[in-house]
């Protein structure tokens, strides 16, 4: 088993899905959290000058959160059993990441007028993405389990990670999508994920 170090800011953000994968796989890693005040000195040392970064065996450093999460999901067995499964996982994760990115744009915007426009975009993205996800989940055993097959996969965990802050801000976000809401509850109740959530750093994002 290689050694892993995950570099990110002291928050959940784009790295939380990676941390959840380490937790559910029971794989040890170094969780290196960089404070914003330290970022300037670290920035030029990081590939693409961005976070998160996954370092493998102190030799290979790779950026891009979704590339990292997909790599870890493949390595740990949470990416499906065949190419069609993986295709579906990618589709669901990309849809959630689009929603997550739109929410982050709202979260980070300081200008009130721009924030209002970005909020409309986020709401439109929700109206496109969430019905599709609800229908996709329901197609697998009525939506009572996971998105694909009988095992929790990357896309299930992504449903929890990507929607955490949006739901904290709007508790009714999934009111019209009861299957998705129940899925998030199942993910959070997974013994290894529940243990991780209980002990993780308490951060705003």
UniProtKB/Swiss-Prot annotation:
Tissues showing expression: Lens.
Keyword line: Eye lens protein
Domain GST N-terminal: start-end pairs: 2-80
Pfam family, one: GST_C_3
InterPro entries hit by this protein: Glutathione-S-Trfase_C-like (IPR010987), Glutathione-S-Trfase_C_sf (IPR036282), Glutathione_S-Trfase_N (IPR004045), GST_C (IPR004046), GST_superfamily (IPR050213), S-crystallin (IPR003083), Thioredoxin-like_sf (IPR036249)
MF (Gene Ontology): glutathione transferase activity; structural constituent of eye lens
TM stretches of this protein: none
Domain named GST C-terminal: residues: 82-205
GO biological process, any: glutathione metabolic process
Function text: S-crystallins are structural components of squids and octopi eye lens. Contains relatively little if any GST activity.
Similarity field: Belongs to the GST superfamily.
PANTHER family for this protein: GLUTATHIONE S-TRANSFERASE
Name the record gives this protein: S-crystallin SL11
Source organism phylogeny: Eukaryota, Metazoa, Spiralia, Lophotrochozoa, Mollusca
